[in-house]
């Protein structure tokens, strides 16, 4: 993977190898994840977003495969810019089941140790908010989509 950001490249390669060990036929597409030279979002923060998003997507694909061995598993990660806003989108297959608590804005982890797990989306949201951005997600059928928006503006990286 070559995105223009070393941290993103390392994470993508690491997570890809982790995923194919347990889901050999998973398709991971990051061709449209690109970072320009005038990126004002710190690499560490990009790593927090991509690392947590990929962990969640890989776990969702694992769960889908465990329930339906013939299911197609995929993760697509892309980025784009609109004005001064930078977006990262992660789309992945999942089993179609979303568990939420009434007051929770994010799906609830299904892992038994929910104190150590279930923080990924909250970490992504916190990171996006550092750049005056936010997080949105949708689930349609068996496709989960996470969208992260951040302001990519000179000086933002110094506020964080």
Description of each model-found segment:
Residues 4-22, 86:
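Short beta-to-alpha transition helix within the HATPase_c
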Residues 27-49, 68:
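Conserved short strand/loop->alpha-helix "switch" segment adjacent to the catalytic nucleotide/phosphoryl-transfer site
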Residues 37-38, 59-81:
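ATP-lid-like helix-loop hinge signature
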Residues 48-60:
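Conserved polar catalytic motif of the HATPase_c/GHKL fold
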Residues 84-118:
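Glycine-rich/acidic phosphate-handling loop/turn and adjacent ATP-lid/helix
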Residues 96, 140-147:
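Glycine-rich nucleotide-binding loop
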Residues 123-132:
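Conserved glycine-/histidine-rich ATP-lid loop and adjacent helix of the Bergerat-fold HATPase_c
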Residues 131-142:
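Glycine-rich ATP-binding loops of the HATPase_c
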């Amino acid at each position: 993977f070559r995105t223009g950001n070393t941290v993103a490249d390392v994470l993508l390669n690491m997570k890809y190898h982790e995923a194919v060990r347990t889901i050999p036929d998973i398709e991971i597409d990051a061709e449209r994840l690109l970072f320009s030279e005038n990126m004002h979002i710190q690499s560490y923060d990009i790593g927090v977003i991509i690392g947590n998003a990929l962990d969640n997507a890989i776990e969702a694909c694992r769960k889908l495969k465990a329930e339906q061995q013939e299911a197609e598993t995929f993760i697509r990660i892309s980025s784009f810019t609109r004005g001064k806003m930078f977006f990262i989108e992660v789309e992945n297959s999942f089993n179609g089941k979303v568990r939420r608590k009434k007051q929770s804005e994010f799906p609830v982890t299904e892992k038994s140790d929910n104190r150590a797990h279930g923080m990924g989306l909250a970490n992504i949201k916190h990171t996006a908010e550092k750049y005056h951005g936010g997080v949105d997600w949708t689930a349609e059928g068996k496709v989960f989509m996470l969208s992260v928006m951040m302001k990519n503006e000179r000086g933002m990286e110094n506020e964080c």
